[in-house]
Amino acid sequence: MITLENDYIKVSLAAKGAELQGLFSKETKLEYLWNANPKYWAKHSPVLFPIVGSLKNNSFTYQGKSYELPRHGFARDHVFNFEKISETEAVFTLTQNEDTLKGYPFYFELKLRYRLIDRKLNLTYKVINTGTAELLFSIGAHPAFAVPNTPNTVYEDYYLAFNADEKLTFWKLEDGLVSDQTALIELGGHRLNLKHDLFYNDALVFKTLQSNCISLLNNKNDYGLHFHFEDFPFFGIWAATDAPFVCLEPWCGVADDINHDQELTHKEGIIKLDIGENWSRFWEVECF
């Protein structure tokens, strides 16, 4: 376990999956991250790479060959190399290996850079094409935040506040794939009240979100967090059935749709990176 801390926050990181496993505020004395209780969901904040969500039949085709990948890809299950740069920064690195090449025929370098900036935790993803052909990939975040995380509150006391005017149209999932059915969630102002039955039919998948900051707040006190993200064209909100957490998931990529032809080059949201090029995105969370 790797620990980063400053005067305001302390985070715990694991080499397996380069996963964030703890987010503690020294000021509020509160833990903001989900504890990975296996009764509900045994993860905290996995990185989704080189795909987001599920593939149709758990497989794709590329240059005439068929390959298999599990839901959300393989990065979350691999041990990353890491370097602790300072008390407030660490970098994790994963490259292709014999195992990854069986299901994903690309050469890559994936870097996750965690930094503490005052009361904020910043996570920057960087992908480098180290191969001799175009690199195709998707990437996404999946942090789970504890709800409730303060005494004398319950799940229904909490809500998500969006920083832009939203018409929350989401795509319904069908056996983990994006269906052709959408639904509209009515907001009270910029506010989505949390309730467990929001997620009884899997994640809410958004393709047209206007906000770049979502705040997790509650009606009983002033504690909460701001979750900021830039240039992620897809977003998911999810919780396991009746679980005491909510996941805020910015994605560059999305699960296959039910009518997808399984050709990787046709996959919605797939990123195409030229030889030697690099690509990056970040998200950050501020606890209060």
PLM features per residue range, with description:
Residues K10-S66:
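Acidic-aromatic substrate-binding/catalytic surfaces of carbohydrate-active enzymes
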Residues Q96-P143, P148:
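Acidic, contiguous internal or C-terminal segments within carbohydrate-active enzymes
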Residues K43-P50, I258-H266:
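Short, structured beta-strand/loop micro-motifs enriched in basic residues and often containing a Trp
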Residues N218-N259:
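Glycine-rich active-site loops that engage anionic ligands at enzyme catalytic sites
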Residues L13, F60-E68, I271-C287:
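Short Pro-Gly-centered flexible turn/kink motifs
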Residues V147, P151-F229:
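Active-site/ligand-binding surface loops and adjacent short beta/alpha elements
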Residues K65-D118:
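Extended, loop-rich substrate-binding clefts of extracytoplasmic carbohydrate-active enzymes
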